[in-house]
Swiss-Prot record:
Protein name: Large ribosomal subunit protein bL27
Domain of life of the organism encoding this protein: Bacteria
UniProt-listed InterPro entries: Ribosomal_bL27, Ribosomal_bL27_CS
Disordered: annotated span: 1-21
GO molecular function: structural constituent of ribosome
Gene Ontology biological process terms, A to Z: translation
Keyword Transferase attributed: no
Family designation: Belongs to the bacterial ribosomal protein bL27 family.
Length: 89
């Protein structure tokens, strides 16, 4: 006969891989067209000017410039890219 009762297996021990969400380019940072600015689930940040919104709600730059975050009166944060000035004088 067994001297000890069989130990039950734990029901824990599983976890999903992190999805690496969040802001990738912060305010004032330079970006080029195609750079990912924010990875998100749903629209925590909303697209402004010169940015696109992917089917997974990724916000990406459409033109080269600097990233700008702006909170409007409705409480939503809008992400835009301010194009760089043309050739410096």
């Amino acid at each position: 006969m067994a001297h000890k009762k069989a130990g039950g297996s734990s029901r824990n021990g599983r976890d999903s891989q992190s999805k690496r969400l969040g802001v990738k380019k912060f305010g004032g940072e330079a970006v080029i067209a195609g750079n990912i600015i924010v990875r998100q689930r749903g629209t925590e940040w909303h697209p402004g000017s010169n940015v696109g919104l992917g089917k997974d709600h990724t916000i990406f730059a459409l033109t080269a410039g600097n990233v700008n975050y702006r909170t409007k009166a409705n409480g939503r944060v809008y992400v835009s890219v301010m194009p760089k000035a043309e050739a410096a004088e």
